[in-house]
């Protein structure tokens, strides 16, 4: 459990967390993911790794596919209302990410459910009851809502319902601990209050740092196009990891590898104080990530490929060469189609 505690950005309340761990009972660890995009990024993978760690400690992972909440749109960190996604688009994304997630998590001690199974069936009276669990003043305690309200920026009532629905998910699955990115802390804490409202023992909120994207500034997101897909080729994953700013790689070491934090600190010290080339340390990071997602052999091959093509500027071994008849007018789309590149 030390691995998770060392990496968590918040554990709230800590005393209740410690009591749960001491109880030795099998805990229900909730993680909700909204299938709003077709891919699983390293950002998602970081928190999915944390969920798997709980499984390895003998606890039950409860993975909620937010097929209902994805229609509402998570307002966390947003300065304006999110565009609503069509149901069929959400279903398509869900079918795409589910097998990837299943490959990350252990098959034992795993429950995967969709929140549309209960949220879509709530009656009007039940929605009114849920809404009565929280006040407008509580909602405006959220920094993003508060900022938008102060600037007279529109906030739809639908957005207020998102954290209510997320909290109700905790009621539905009887969560003992809910984990998520640090931007979810307010939502997770509201989940505690909603569980209390329904006369349940409140969950503990446990958040982890948000992984920064390849641009080195914004959180990794498919909407920002600064992400690394875990289903990308080993060569591409390795190359993209090598492209991240040096100062960002420590977050990647912390959230995406099993290295001890003291060992990571030593790497950082060697660069800052002893003049060690950060390039060499980042190569290790790339190998560790690719090795976990694929294999040690694939990681070595990706490193060699990066060295040959990116550093030494050699021609790739799998480079395809096509002959074009110069007497004909060149029509690029046709050439690509004929050679199976489209």
Label for each model-derived stretch:
Residues 11-74, 179-185, 191:
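N-terminal catalytic cores of NTP/NDP-binding nucleotidyl/phosphoryl-transfer enzymes
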Residues 78-83, 128-132, 224:
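Short, hinge-like loop/turn segments at secondary-structure boundaries
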Residues 8, 86-208, 216:
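Divalent-metal (Mg2+/Mn2+/Ca2+)-assisted nucleotide/phosphate chemistry catalytic cores
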């Amino acid at each position: 459990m030390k691995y998770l505690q060392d990496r968590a950005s918040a554990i709230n309340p800590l005393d209740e967390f410690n009591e749960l761990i001491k109880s030795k009972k099998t805990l229900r660890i909730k993680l909700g993911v909204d299938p709003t995009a077709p891919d699983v990024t390293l950002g998602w993978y970081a928190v999915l790794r944390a969920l798997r760690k709980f499984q390895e400690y003998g606890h039950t992972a409860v993975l909620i596919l937010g097929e209902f909440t994805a229609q509402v749109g998570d307002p966390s960190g947003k300065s304006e209302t999110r565009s609503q996604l069509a149901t069929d688009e959400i279903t398509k994304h869900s079918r795409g990410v589910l097998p990837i997630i299943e490959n990350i998590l252990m098959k034992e001690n795993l429950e995967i459910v969709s929140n549309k199974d209960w949220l879509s069936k709530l009656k009007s009276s039940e929605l009114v009851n849920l809404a009565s669990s929280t006040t407008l003043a509580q909602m405006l305690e959220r920094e993003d809502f508060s900022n938008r309200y102060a600037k007279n920026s529109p906030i739809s009532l639908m957005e207020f319902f998102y954290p209510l629905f997320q909290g109700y998910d905790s009621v539905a699955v009887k969560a003992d601990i809910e984990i998520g990115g640090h931007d979810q802390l307010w939502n997770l804490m509201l989940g505690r209050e909603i569980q209390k409202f329904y006369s349940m023992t409140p969950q503990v909120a446990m958040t982890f740092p948000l992984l920064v994207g390849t641009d080195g500034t914004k959180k990794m997101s498919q909407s920002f196009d600064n992400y690394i897909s875990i289903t990308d080729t080993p060569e591409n994953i390795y190359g993209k990891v090598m492209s991240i700013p040096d100062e960002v790689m420590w977050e990647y070491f912390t959230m995406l590898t099993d290295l001890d934090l003291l060992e990571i600190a030593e790497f950082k010290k060697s660069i800052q104080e002893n003049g060690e080339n950060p390039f060499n340390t980042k190569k290790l990071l790339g190998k560790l990530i690719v090795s976990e997602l694929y294999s040690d052999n694939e990681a070595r091959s990706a490193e060699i490929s990066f060295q040959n093509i990116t550093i030494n500027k050699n021609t790739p071994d799998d480079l395809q060469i096509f002959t074009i008849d110069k007497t004909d007018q060149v029509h690029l789309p046709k050439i690509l189609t004929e050679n199976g590149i489209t």
